[in-house]
Amino acid sequence: MNALILSSGTGGGHDAAGKAVYEEMKKRGHQVTMLNPYTLKSTKLSGRIDRTYISTVQHVPRAFGVVYKIGNIYRRLPFRSPIYFVNRGMTNVMQKYFAEHPVDIVIMPHLFPAEIMTNMKHHGIQIPKTMFIATDYVCTPFTEETDCDAYVIPAADLTEEFVGKGIPREKLYPLGIPTNSSFLEERTRKQEKQLLGLKTDKKYILITGGSMGGGKIEKTIEELQNFSSDREDVELIVICGSNQKLYQKLQEKNSPGVTVLEHTDRMASYMRASHLFITKPGGLSSTEAAVCHVPILHTSAIPGCESCNADYFAGHGMSISENLTDELPRIVDEVLQNTDKSAEMMTCQNNTINKAAAADICRLAEQLVSEAFSGND
């Protein structure tokens, strides 16, 4: 099988989901390519789209709440969204790519490429089988205007949510959000601490704002610093992502008991080494944490799909959600002290999240391609 994974740099979760499927495809002996489709037209265009998104997340996240509300209103209107029409300009680019690089299936963990493929289909251009992977625990605006052969959704109990928005029930596959195999490794908290060079007698709180360093990390750290300074057994680990300004600011503070990192390729290990993970509720990062079985405290949700992610996780007992930073020390202390509460959270994660999502998605892709070949016989 020859697969193409199309993603976009607007949020690390989409790319991470795509890379998880890419990794699994390679393991299964398939040919697979992953790319950002906009780079085929212009690297400047691709970079501009990515930078605009990242800058908005870091500086004016509330703008996403406004856009999300507009999207939910717009989706009720009897015509297609601006996103659909903007992506029409990519049809010729992708048609040329397929002529030069034929593939059996296109897998898309991002809405924009799905809009491109839908445009091509509606213009009578022959395209491969298509699969969309939802990376949030909600049907995000305009997903319903795409026309893919299969839609992978995070969980079975979200089926009615997607059907209600217009996705055909027979196209829905509740296989979960795919995660990198590193999150599936089974090492104890003590083993991970030793591998990372951390103190085995300390309790670590891991704080991130997602791959782009969004969220009120500074305020969160300020609230938790006094708490951790009063507790000799507690230390903070902060991962800033690509937010260089935040990283430099925290480095200059050089606060005791606080370890500051930029990017890390050992996120799974840091999660398993931690007693608590504080993060904004991105769909992919939350799923990764649940796969690792680490207690989660969601905060600083970007209004819109992240609010829905937080509600889903809290509603299923997989996390605690709190946006008031002055309440964080009390909640953190409760989680660290109450081992039963932490254990219950991890049990709920284990019962709700499909760890084998990447493998299941690859099996579905194989099935779709096999059916396509059978139909052509």
Describe each region flagged by the PLM.
Residues 20-95:
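Conserved N-terminal ligand/cofactor-binding loop architecture of enzyme catalytic domains
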Residues 277-279, 295-304:
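Short hydrophobic beta-strand element within catalytic cores of glycosyltransferases
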Residues 272-282:
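Acidic donor-binding loop of glycosyltransferase active sites
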Residues 149-211:
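A nucleotide-sugar donor-handling region in carbohydrate enzymes
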Residues 191, 198-273:
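Donor-nucleotide binding loops and adjacent catalytic segments primarily
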Residues 188, 320, 325-326, 333-350, ...:
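Conserved donor-nucleotide binding/catalytic region of nucleotide-linked donor-dependent transferases
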Residues 12, 17, 73-166, 171-174:
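Active-site and donor-binding regions of nucleotide-sugar-utilizing enzymes
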